[in-house]
Amino acid sequence: MKFVNHIEPVAPRRAGGAVAEVYAEARREFGRLPEPLAMLSPDEGLLTAGWATLRETLLVGQVPRGRKEAVAAAVAASLRCPWCVDAHTTMLYAAGQTDTAAAILAGTAPAAGDPNAPYVAWAAGTGTPAGPPAPFGPDVAAEYLGTAVQFHFIARLVLVLLDETFLPGGPRAQQLMRRAGGLVFARKVRAEHRPGRSTRRLEPRTLPDDLAWATPSEPIATAFAALSHHLDTAPHLPPPTRQVVRRVVGSWHGEPMPMSSRWTNEHTAELPADLHAPTRLALLTGLAPHQVTDDDVAAARSLLDTDAALVGALAWAAFTAARRIGTWIGAAAEGQVSRQNPTG
């Protein structure tokens, strides 16, 4: 598939079973099959759960689609993911929110009068516990928190597996393409969809405590519980690698990693030599996806020797970091509610 590196997604013409169902749903509701979704297809369980978290956060619910695209675009910009920024700003044009799109593309804050401004500021700051307060109430918190966590997850995978952008040409041509894409997808962005449709093929799973922020929305909670269970039980990464990554991510507070990727060496040194490369790749994917090189991926292939194993390992690492972010933005949002509604 064009634009995808290191793996071969399932081609639409060869898709069957749940993969074909997800592809059809995505085309119907997005207007096309997005590469960041197709890249999950070597692992059918990951694709079905990943589609559910994507759909139930971004495409349905009380919060307007355009507002969620602004949140997703701001998260993408904070991670310096050009593909993601191009995709979400195109959808902002489709939603008619051109000022928000222009500000994010320019790397500036939206104007004070832009209704999306506080949401963009919040989303841009979700990468650290010191971000601005949430500008939303508890009735829609799961939608906003889920959108932010979803795109902290997906953007990390995109940075490793996809080209820098899908737009051809230079800046002027790319801007024209974004606006043209906005016209193409305008009807899809404004369409309303019924919550929960993507979760019907998922088995019920227990929602982990660190994802408790999703509880108020049954479809979002079901989707994230399924994704968490699938990634945590997949066999692709051995327990010693998972233990190291969980420990390092668990002590991370959003600070940028050193510019040299040698920071991983102190964490892999304790492991057997054959686990150094996959552990390094997992650490980089979660905490410094820009530092992942083709050589890093190739070196990890000795253990991650299938496309399903590679995408599953990368997804687990990316989701581990996104879950960590979810703990602090979820706690901050809950704390705001507690302060606004004191008891006693």
Swiss-Prot record:
Taxonomic superkingdom: Bacteria
Gene Ontology cellular component terms for the protein in this record: peptidoglycan-based cell wall; plasma membrane
Effect of residue 50 to A: Abolishes interaction with PknI
UniProt activity-regulation remark: Interaction with PknI increases the peroxidase activity by several folds.
Family stated for the protein in its record: Belongs to the AhpD family.
Miscellaneous: Though the Rv2159c protein is a peroxidase, it does not form disulfide bridges between the two catalytic site cysteines.
Name by which UniProt lists this protein: Alkyl hydroperoxide reductase Rv2159c
Lineage per the UniProt record: Bacteria, Bacillati, Actinomycetota, Actinomycetes, Mycobacteriales
